[in-house]
Structure formats: C-alpha cells, structure tokens
C-alpha cells in the first residue's frame, strides 16, 4: 500500500540545505543519468524535513540520499529491500519531492506486485506525478521506476 502525504515545508530553504550534500560524484544505482548522492545518515537530514516525516511514518530512518534528474534522466525499475542474508523484515521506503518546476518531469511508477497476492506481468503500474512537498511512503520490496524527465529543468 502506498501512502500519499503533503508536507508543509519551506522548500526553497530545504533545497539550499540539501544542495550542500551534492559535493561529490555521487553514486550509480538505479539512476540513468542525473545525480544520486552517496548514502547519508539520519543525523544529516535537515530537522524541518525529519520532524515532518516522523509525524507521518512510524519507523526509524536508517539512510537517505539526494536524487536530481535533469532532462532525459530516469531511474530504472528497482526496489530498496536488502536480500543479503540474514534476510530482514520488509521495511519502509519513501520519496519526497522538493523541486518540481515543470510538468512532465517523470512520474514514479509502482509495479502491481504489491497490490495482489498473485500479480501478473500485465498488471498496470500505479502512477504518481511528482509535486512539491509530496511524500510517498511504500514497502521497501515494492519495485518502482521513474519515467524520463521531459523538462529542461532539474527535479529534486
């Protein structure tokens, strides 16, 4: 089940703070183009964001990162579940949109596998449009992808 929240944050200030973490080459994971920071610790998360997430999500923040997609950048289908033995219980993942200056900046698609006990390849994905201050929470074993950003501006 996907939970959809709208937070009330000063996004301009938050974006400035988060851009301080964009100071290295980042890492290559599911991102095809664009930038993904290295993993960051909970202590690094700006308090205004962490406090509002804590109000919405029952759980402990373990790690987070900054993702920036420019024109044509996308994220391939992936999940966040760690299957390395010993296998852990399924956790919670989320995405928070800070900067969404245009339309057509790449919807996030959640695959239908988590919606039914017997999914098929033909299950249509659940589609969510990026919007500023939108927080989406989902199980960490839920496969998801991001469509290409069709704008000349960056989405964060």
Language-model-derived ranges and their functions:
Residues 59-148, 153-156:
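Catalytic core of non-heme Fe(II) oxygenases with the double-stranded beta-helix
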Residues 1-62, 72-75, 107:
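Non-heme Fe(II)/2-oxoglutarate
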């Amino acid at each position: 089940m996907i939970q959809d929240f709208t937070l009330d944050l000063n996004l301009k200030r938050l974006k400035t703070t988060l851009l301080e973490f964009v100071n290295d080459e980042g890492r290559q994971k599911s991102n095809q183009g664009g930038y993904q920071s290295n993993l960051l610790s909970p202590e690094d998360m700006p308090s205004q964001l962490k406090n509002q997430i804590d109000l919405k999500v029952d759980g402990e923040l373990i790690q987070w990162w900054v993702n920036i997609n420019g024109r044509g950048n996308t994220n391939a289908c992936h999940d966040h579940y760690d299957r390395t033995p010993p296998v852990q219980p399924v956790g919670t993942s989320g995405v928070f949109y800070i900067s969404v200056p245009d339309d057509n900046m790449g919807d996030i698609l959640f695959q239908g596998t988590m919606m039914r006990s017997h999914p098929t390849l033909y299950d249509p994905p659940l589609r969510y449009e990026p919007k500023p201050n939108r927080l989406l929470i989902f199980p960490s074993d839920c496969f998801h992808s991001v469509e290409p950003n069709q704008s000349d501006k960056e989405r964060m």
